[in-house]
Regions:
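Short "lid" loop at the C-terminus of a central beta-strand within the Rossmann-like core
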Residues: 2-5, 54, 85-89
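A short acidic, Gly/Pro-enriched loop at the edge of an enzyme's catalytic core
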Residues: 36-48
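A short SAM/SAH-binding and catalytic strip from SAM-dependent methyltransferases
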Residues: 46-61
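A short glycine-rich, Lys/Arg-flanked "PGG" loop and its adjoining helix->strand segment in the class I
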Residues: 63-76
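Conserved class I S-adenosyl-L-methionine
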Residues: 81-101
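Core SAM-dependent methyltransferase catalytic element
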Residues: 105-106, 119-142
Length: 142
């Protein structure tokens, strides 16, 4: 089973339609929630993925806490991949310091790619400086 926690209003019907179109609706569940306070016990999931969500979470001003909350629900040995505006110091502070904190908290394998927009992963035609800048990719195994 796959679960998706959606923080934005609307869109749930579209998610369900896409799942049906891909033939996976019997394996996925979508629910409204708050990424700052996930309604799941510790170590519930084998994997967690987030793409440009954390900086949008209004219920937690400290975006590092949103990352920690996402990691809380990942099982020991589980994988994660988070892409967000990690290079924006006003949101995440110093990433070297944050990565150290995550390692000290027990994250076993931790990788970070700063400025993803400069790595050639994002097609140039969708790169708008006001939209796709300061992007970092944080991934690994808990």
């Amino acid at each position: 089973e796959r679960r998706s926690v959606k923080i934005a209003r609307g869109g749930q019907q579209l998610c369900q339609q896409n799942a049906a179109a891909e033939g996976v609706s019997h394996r996925v569940r979508f629910q409204k929630g708050d990424a700052a306070h996930l309604a799941f016990p510790d170590e519930t999931f084998e994997a967690a993925v987030s793409n440009f969500v954390f900086h949008e979470v209004r219920t937690q001003p400290d975006k590092r806490e949103v990352v920690r909350e996402a990691l809380r629900v990942v099982k020991k040995g589980g994988c994660f991949a988070f892409q967000d505006l990690f290079e924006k110091e006003s949101l995440y502070g110093d990433m070297t310091d944050f990565l150290s904190q995550l390692r000290q908290a027990g994250v076993q394998e931790l990788h970070y790619i700063p400025h993803v927009e400069r790595q050639g992963f994002i097609p140039r035609y969708v790169q708008a400086p006001w939209m796709l800048s300061d992007v970092g990719l944080l991934y690994g195994r808990k």
